[in-house]
């Protein structure tokens, strides 16, 4: 908030023309205060909240005391021109009304210039050193009074309340709470007393989600792996922004391609879109949806307005969907954008290639006709998410967030279906009821990384509210208009998090290796010496139309060349020397089988084609010859 305090003898205000729909209702179009008073010109700014009204009143009292005004006469004047970053008119009006009421309650004689009107005014300001003062008032952080979440472990038909040491229940206000069996999680980790078997990964997720155990570890092998493949912090940008060197850029684009491929294989039409990453916070639907992210909003000021940088593709896809003419015949359908996304994570919380302020999200929204269809597709999306993580040899632990206790009772049948699919305990977080939540059920899919920390990768949600907020409707069979129900889905998670999961999976193997399709270098051809370079280049050129192949033509020893290829986890290293040329064979160091063997080039090509089948392909993002590549690129 910006405030200008003017010690005045007189102010006359006349409302001339209504400017805003939120404008005050006028009792009188003008007032004239012809006595000593403090005129307070106020601009409420974006990011303020109602707490600034109380702070404004305190500043008014301080200024009156500082100037030495004995009469408690104050004129409040809304004056947006004090800032280039104004709040919404709704909030500005609420702040001014609250300040007015607070001053009245403390015995002040208060006048308020009408809000939302074009006005003319005359003012006579005194001429002493303290007659004109200004203040910038910062809002206090307002904690949401949501009560406590209820944490349950759901195991088939049974529910177990999670309690901590000394039976301190972490939940309250959950009906029939005493009818639930209790799980005693003793902290610190000195054992868990459980009536049901759970695996270690699930236990770690519970300890992290419920008890906030498990800090980031500075020495993280996953950081070293990410850097090796070219994922780095960009020091010339903001916290949490990365740069992507050629191998990293290639991997990101391959996951981009793969996310589109699997979306197009779903059993309904999926449309690929693109759009902007900035949305106007003065627009009602945008402002309402943005509130859900609070301090994690990434904002940009322009000459037009204050914009929020999107944290997924919701805004753009909903903005497109609201303009469509939809029939029941068009629904269900999906909309996908691999969206550059922004979240204002705290500097100390960012994690290379995982928790970022800017990342890429293959964000898929599915628009359905009704709840039955939404639940059907929700279960399909769940199965697809589980299928994709199993392709890389992993499994997820599930945290299911439920919007309210009422929703838990109403939609428990969905959770039962999820349980029947995964056949293992689920962690449920049941929230107190709130109008702020747009979803009724929100599933987070977690892996546990090599350091024992839960890492959310995929997600799916049922959204009952945004179609009404944005006005997304279809015409039903009977000719009536109905709002769609929306599913939010990240089948792979963000691109960076999916790659993080691939790195984490690779580190668990005897010899770390990535899936063939996403290995930035799939084959490296190494001549034993310069004498065999020409033949090695012929081999490389024969492969490069189908595979990403590099030729190590550097003036280095054979051992050095092999070591460098091994450090990059290259799946197939082909060594070419006198024996290979003479026998018309190649010697292959096979990282998947952890073997060295002789084979024909044709047999190796067949093996690699089988590994590549069903996945996207892109060529190298650099030259084939390593001699042309700068060091550290």
UniProtKB/Swiss-Prot annotation:
Cofactor: Zn(2+)
E.C. code: 6.1.1.3
Listed name of the protein: Threonine--tRNA ligase
Residues the record lists as binding Zn(2+): 314, 365, 488
Classification via CDD domains: ThrRS_anticodon (cd00860)
Biological function: Catalyzes the attachment of threonine to tRNA(Thr) in a two-step reaction: L-threonine is first activated by ATP to form Thr-AMP and then transferred to the acceptor end of tRNA(Thr). Also edits incorrectly charged L-seryl-tRNA(Thr).
Gene Ontology terms, MF aspect: ATP binding; threonine-tRNA ligase activity; tRNA binding; zinc ion binding
Subunit composition and interactions: Homodimer.
Keywords linked to the UniProt accession: Aminoacyl-tRNA synthetase, ATP-binding, Cytoplasm, Ligase, Metal-binding, Nucleotide-binding, Protein biosynthesis, RNA-binding, tRNA-binding, Zinc
Top-level division of the source organism's lineage: Archaea
Protein's organism: Nanoarchaeum equitans (strain Kin4-M)
Region of interest (Editing domain), residue spans: 1-143
Domain notes: The N-terminal domain is an archaea-specific tRNA-editing domain that hydrolyzes incorrectly charged L-seryl-tRNA(Thr). Catalysis of tRNA editing is performed by the charged tRNA itself.
InterPro entries: aa-tRNA-synt_IIb, aa-tRNA-synth_II, aa-tRNA-synth_II/BPL/LPL, Anticodon-bd, Anticodon-bd_dom_sf, DTD-like_sf, Thr-tRNA-ligase_IIa, Threonyl-tRNA_syn_edit_dom_arc
GO terms under cellular component: cytoplasm
Family: Belongs to the class-II aminoacyl-tRNA synthetase family.
Primary localisation category: cytoplasm
Biological process, per Gene Ontology: threonyl-tRNA aminoacylation
Catalytic reaction(s) noted: tRNA(Thr) + L-threonine + ATP = L-threonyl-tRNA(Thr) + AMP + diphosphate + H(+)
Keyword Cytoplasm: yes
Compartment(s): Cytoplasm
Region Catalytic: start-end pairs: 220-515, 221-515
Cofactor note: Binds 1 zinc ion per subunit.
């Amino acid at each position: 908030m910006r405030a200008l305090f003017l010690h005045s003898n007189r102010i006359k205000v006349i409302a001339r023309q209504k400017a805003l729909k939120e404008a005050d209702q006028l009792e009188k179009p003008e007032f004239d205060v012809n006595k000593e008073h403090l005129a307070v010109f106020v601009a409420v700014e974006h990011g303020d909240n109602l707490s600034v009204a109380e702070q404004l009143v305190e500043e008014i009292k301080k200024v009156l005391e500082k100037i030495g005004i004995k009469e408690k006469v104050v004129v409040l004047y809304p004056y947006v021109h004090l800032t280039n970053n104004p709040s919404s008119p709704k909030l500005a009006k609420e702040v001014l009304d609250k300040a007015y009421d607070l001053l009245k309650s403390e015995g002040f004689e208060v006048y308020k210039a009408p809000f939302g009107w074009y006005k003319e005014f005359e003012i006579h300001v005194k001429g002493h050193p303290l007659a004109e003062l200004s203040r910038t008032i910062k809002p206090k952080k307002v904690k949401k009074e949501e009560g406590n979440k209820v944490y349950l472990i759901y195991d088939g038909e049974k529910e177990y309340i999670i309690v901590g040491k000394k039976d301190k229940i972490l939940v309250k206000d959950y009906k029939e709470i005493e009818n639930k069996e209790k799980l005693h999680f003793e902290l610190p980790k000195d054992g868990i007393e459980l009536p049901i078997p759970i695996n270690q990964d699930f236990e770690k997720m519970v300890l992290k989600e419920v008890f906030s155990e498990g800090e980031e570890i500075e020495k993280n092998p996953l950081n070293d792996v990410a850097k090796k493949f070219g994922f780095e912090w960009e020091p010339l940008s903001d916290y949490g922004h990365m740069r992507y060197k050629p191998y990293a850029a290639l991997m990101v684009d391959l996951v981009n391609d793969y996310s589109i491929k699997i979306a197009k294989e779903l059993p309904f039409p999926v449309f690929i879109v693109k759009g902007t990453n900035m949305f106007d916070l003065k627009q009602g639907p945008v402002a309402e949806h943005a509130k859900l992210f609070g301090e994690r909003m990434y904002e940009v000021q322009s000459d037009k307005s204050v914009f929020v940088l999107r944290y997924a593709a919701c805004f753009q896809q909903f903005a497109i969907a609201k303009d469509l003419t939809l029939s029941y015949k068009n629904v269900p359908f999906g909309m996908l954008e691999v969206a550059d996304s922004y979240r204002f994570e705290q500097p100390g919380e960012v994690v290379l290639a995982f928790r970022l302020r800017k990342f890429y999200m293959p964000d898929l929204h599915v628009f359905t006709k009704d709840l039955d269809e939404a639940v059907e597709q929700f279960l399909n999306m769940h199965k697809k998410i589980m299928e994709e993580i199993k392709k890389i040899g992993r499994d997820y632990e599930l945290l299911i967030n439920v919007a309210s206790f009422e929703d838990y009772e109403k939609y428990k049948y969905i959770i039962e279906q999820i349980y029947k699919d995964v056949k293992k305990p689920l962690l449920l977080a049941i929230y107190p009821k709130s109008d702020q939540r747009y979803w009724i059920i929100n599933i987070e899919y977690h892996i546990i990384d090599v350091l024992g920390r839960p890492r959310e990768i995929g997600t799916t949600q049922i959204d009952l509210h945004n179609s009404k907020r944005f006005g997304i409707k279809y015409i039903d069979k009977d000719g009536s208009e109905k709002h769609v129900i929306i599913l939010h889905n990240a089948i792979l998670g963000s691109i960076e998090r999916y790659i993080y999961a691939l790195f984490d999976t690779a580190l668990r193997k005897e010899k770390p290796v990535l899936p063939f399709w996403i290995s930035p270098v799939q084959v490296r051809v190494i001549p034993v010496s310069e004498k065999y370079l020409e033949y090695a280049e012929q081999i490389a050129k024969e492969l490069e139309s189908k595979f990403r192949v590099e030729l190590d033509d550097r003036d280095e020893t054979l051992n050095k060349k092999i070591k460098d290829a091994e450090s990059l986890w290259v799946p197939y290293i082909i060594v070419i020397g006198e024996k290979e040329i003479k026998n018309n064979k190649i010697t292959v160091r096979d990282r998947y089988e952890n073997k060295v063997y002789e084979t024909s080039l044709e047999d190796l090509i067949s093996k690699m084609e089988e590994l590549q089948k069903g996945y996207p392909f892109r060529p190298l993002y650099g030259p084939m010859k390593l001699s042309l590549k700068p060091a550290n690129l």
